[in-house]
Amino acid sequence: MSMQFGSSTEFSNMCGVTLMNTPIGRVVAEVMGAKDGVELTEYPSMIRVDGQRLLDFDYEELTDALGQEFDGSIFEEISSTHYGRMVHLDEKTLLFASPEDAAEYIGFDLTAQ
């Protein structure tokens, strides 16, 4: 396990969230880690989920993997910090690296005034 610290002014095209390292958090991380462009970093009490461009936490997919209901309230319970634009919908939570990609969900006006 290595930790990287630092800052950069360039756009990273990354977004991510920290999940609690609990039985539910671990299953959610495993489902997300199986997706292309997603990297997991495990710590004793948390799991970082970092993705390129978009992270899509599909509640139906997570419900199937867990064998019990998963929804936005459970996502909020197992997550703490995040980076990127987070959008909660009835059926999923989305994290976008770019506000332009999230524009239709967050009311971000892309036209020049």
From Swiss-Prot:
It comes from the Bacteria. Gene3D superfamilies: Monooxygenase component MmoB/DmpM (3.90.56.10). SUPFAM superfamilies: Monooxygenase (hydroxylase) regulatory protein (SSF56029). GO terms for molecular function: monooxygenase activity. InterPro entries: MOase_MmoB_DmpM (IPR003454), mOase_MmoB_DmpM_sf (IPR036889). Induction: By propane. Belongs to the TmoD/XamoD family. The propane 2-monooxygenase multicomponent enzyme system is composed of an electron transfer component and a monooxygenase component interacting with the effector protein PrmD. The electron transfer component is composed of a reductase (PrmB), and the monooxygenase component is formed by a large subunit (PrmA) and a small subunit (PrmC). Effector component of the propane 2-monooxygenase multicomponent enzyme system which is involved in the degradation of propane via the O2-dependent hydroxylation of propane. This is Propane 2-monooxygenase, effector component.
